[in-house]
From Swiss-Prot:
Protein name: Phenylalanine--tRNA ligase alpha subunit
Catalysis performed (reactions): tRNA(Phe) + L-phenylalanine + ATP = L-phenylalanyl-tRNA(Phe) + AMP + diphosphate + H(+)
Required cofactor(s): Mg(2+)
Cellular compartments annotated: Cytoplasm
Entry similarity comment: Belongs to the class-II aminoacyl-tRNA synthetase family. Phe-tRNA synthetase alpha subunit type 1 subfamily.
Note on how the cofactor is bound: Binds 2 magnesium ions per tetramer.
Name of a matching Pfam family: tRNA-synt_2d
Subunit structure: Tetramer of two alpha and two beta subunits.
Main location per the UniProt record: cytoplasm
Sorted UniProt keywords: Aminoacyl-tRNA synthetase, ATP-binding, Cytoplasm, Ligase, Magnesium, Metal-binding, Nucleotide-binding, Protein biosynthesis
Entry EC number(s): 6.1.1.20
Alphabetized SUPFAM superfamilies for the sequence: Class II aaRS and biotin synthetases, tRNA-binding arm
Amino acid sequence: MQQLTEIVEQALVIIDQASDLKALDDIRVDYLGKKGKITDMMKMMGSLSPEEKPAFGQAVNDAKQAIQQKLTERIDGLKSAELEAKLIAEKIDVTLPGRTIDIGGLHPVTRTIERIETFFGELGFSVKQGPEIEDDFHNFDALNISEHHPARADHDTFYFNPKLMLRTQTSGVQIRTMETEKPPLRIISPGRVYRNDYDQTHTPMFHQVEGLLVDENVNFAELKGVLHDFLRNFFEEDLQVRFRPSYFPFTEPSAEVDVMGKNGKWLEVLGCGMVHPNVLRSVGIDPEKYSGFAFGMGVERLTMLRYGVNDLRAFFENDLRFLKQFK
């Protein structure tokens, strides 16, 4: 028994002196392992009398528990000290501002298109899409644009061959819709269009939204009402709006629409008119029964006016300093 007591006392001292977890694990093996000192003491049971064995066995178990308890306490203490040292080394100043997440935003042109689609969607207009590579029938002929019209010139239009080109307006979508669907029709057709022009207010590629309504007894007063409401909704103010007589091959009568700018000058924002009877005939719609109105607007121009941008080219230069202003 004296030897067992000495082993326990020795183990407890060594455990207190251990400086790391590796040393504690070595102590555990030396005293409690299969070949450890406490395990060796159990082998002495064979030399004891039956009367002595119970007391000796109990003493060995108590010794094992004492050593194991001390090991557990010392391990917990070292782990706690290790964690505290780590936390001190990695101390965080909680008063510092957090790292912000850079959230993306819609491009201003996309925002404008969505705003237009939302307004006309509430009036029952559906959104239609069409090909950007267009044939001369859908881009010119069906729109009552004569063979010698300036819009067909090489310096205005990007041709692949005499019959195939990049579309110069989204009006071809209206033609394709009227070819496949019967009146009444209410559609808008947003999309990219292409013209051979590049300066402060023009780019070779830009976006248009064109609208078409075909039904019985459609008149110019309805067109004026729709566009007047749209412009007030888009610019979110009660603007002065005027309709100027103009000419477009595909509408008759035709008009250009201006709004009064903050500088006291009229600004052109879109074109419109009653669908020309020849356009209706080209797609098999009887102009004696049906009439309609159409309008078209440059998305970039509307965006420039809404946000006060002076150079249209800024929308396509992908300068984040510019684009982040529209989040």
